Every structure is written in structure tokens, then in C-alpha cells.
């Protein structure tokens, strides 16, 4: 994910146009916010559930609905 994002940033910068530079800048900011948000959510899930196992952490939608919404929003915006 990081390599793909930075490849797109580099491609935009290499166009040397205003659209490319502003798009690269926007993508860098968005990537930084999304990635740090996903790491924050992973830490919150670990602190509340006490495990990193996906088998143990099933049913998070029922247990933490707002956190599940944030997972969806950040994952979809990180694509």
C-alpha cells in the first residue's frame, strides 16, 4: 500500500504540472492521515479485546459499532 501510494505521488510529481503537484501533495496528506488512523484503530481494538487474533475478535460490529464504521471509512479511503 505504501509503495503504491508513493509511486502515484512520484508519478504526479514527475508530470511537473500544477495538477500533478497538488494531487501528489493531497495524496501524501491523505495517506498519512489514513495510515495513522488505521494504526490507531488497531491499537484501540487490541487494548479493548486483548488479542490480535482475528478468530478471537469476531463480532466487532456488535461489540463496537462506531469503531467498525471508522474501520470501513479508513480502509476504503486508503484504497
From Swiss-Prot:
EC number: 7.1.1.2
GO cellular component, one term: mitochondrial membrane
Main location: mitochondrion
Annotated catalysed reactions: a ubiquinone + NADH + 5 H(+)(in) = a ubiquinol + NAD(+) + 4 H(+)(out)
Example of a GO MF term: NADH dehydrogenase (ubiquinone) activity
Keyword tags: Electron transport, Membrane, Mitochondrion, NAD, Respiratory chain, Translocase, Transmembrane, Transmembrane helix, Transport, Ubiquinone
Subcellular location: Mitochondrion membrane
Any one GO biological process: ATP synthesis coupled electron transport
Transmembrane segments annotated in the record for this chain: 24-44, 54-74
Keyword Membrane among record annotations: yes
Entry keyword annotation includes DNA repair: no
Listed InterPro entries: NADH_UbQ_OxRdtase, ND/Mrp_TM
Membrane topology value: Multi-pass membrane protein
Sequence similarity: Belongs to the complex I subunit 4 family.
The protein's role, per its UniProt record: Core subunit of the mitochondrial membrane respiratory chain NADH dehydrogenase (Complex I) that is believed to belong to the minimal assembly required for catalysis. Complex I functions in the transfer of electrons from NADH to the respiratory chain. The immediate electron acceptor for the enzyme is believed to be ubiquinone.
Descriptive protein name: NADH-ubiquinone oxidoreductase chain 4
Lineage of the species this protein comes from: Eukaryota, Metazoa, Ecdysozoa, Arthropoda, Hexapoda
